[in-house]
Amino acid sequence: MDPAASPAAAPPAAPAAAPAADPAADPAAALPGQALAQAPALAQINGQEGARNERAAYLWRPWLSSINDQPRQARSLVDWADNRATAAEAAKTDSDFHHPVRLYWPKSHSFDYLYSAGEILLNNFPVQATINLYEDSDSADNEEDKEEEEEEEEEEDDEEEEEDEDKDVNENEPEVCMGVSEATTHKATAHSPDPHSACPN
């Protein structure tokens, strides 16, 4: 069998033949002990205080980076040190959102949320979020306006009902005094509580 014809039979490349890792390209790989030395710093960044607060180490905080992602964090720490950035600035650049993300939406627009805009907003939002409704000045004004409008409508309805009752009463009364002289009509209208009625009764 020809050794050149069988690529599977070729021995793997020796580890010594691999190119040497460039320490400047990957600082975490260049200093393996440094990642372990920075573990307390990583624990503090992640909100875990180590031995002082053991219970906090077991709580899952999705808004903080995972402690299991140490190589990425070690690289980030080295990059921060190179750029002279503070830990707060670095945490801010690492993630723009801190979970739980809450989007505040005015109650006056809650109808819009239920039927279109809020659903579209949540679907297009880059992270999981919840919408919290808040009292805005518009919604308080709208409630007062609605109450005033309801009161006005009730008053108008009451007035219309009274007018309808008056018309019904006037239409149902027979007019008895059609042939009364002008003098008596004048006298009757002077004492009559209803000026439209020509009857003295």
Curated annotation (Swiss-Prot):
Region (Ripply homology domain): 99-134
WRPW motif (motif): residue ranges: 57-60
A Pfam family assignment: Ripply
Subcellular location: Nucleus
Tissue expression profile of the protein: Expressed in the anterior presomitic mesoderm and somites of stage E9.5 dpc embryos. Also expressed in tongue, diaphragm and intercostal muscles at 16.5 dpc.
Superkingdom as given in the UniProt entry: Eukaryota
Record GO biological process: bone morphogenesis; embryonic pattern specification; negative regulation of DNA-templated transcription; Notch signaling pathway; regulation of gene expression; somite rostral/caudal axis specification; somite specification
Compositionally biased residues, Acidic residues: 136-174
One term under GO cellular component: nucleus
Main location: nucleus
Biased composition (Low complexity): 15-29
Ranges for region Disordered: 1-29, 136-201
InterPro entries to which the protein is assigned, alphabetical: Ripply_fam (IPR028127)
Swiss-Prot/TrEMBL keywords: Developmental protein, Nucleus, Repressor, Transcription, Transcription regulation
Family to which this protein belongs: Belongs to the ripply family.
Known function: Plays a role in somitogenesis. Essential for transcriptional repression of the segmental patterning genes, thus terminating the segmentation program in the presomitic mesoderm, and also required for the maintenance of rostrocaudal polarity in somites.
Domain notes: The ripply homology domain is required for transcriptional repression. The WRPW motif is required for binding to TLE/GROUCHO proteins.
Protein name (record): Protein ripply1
Record lineage: Eukaryota, Metazoa, Chordata, Craniata, Vertebrata
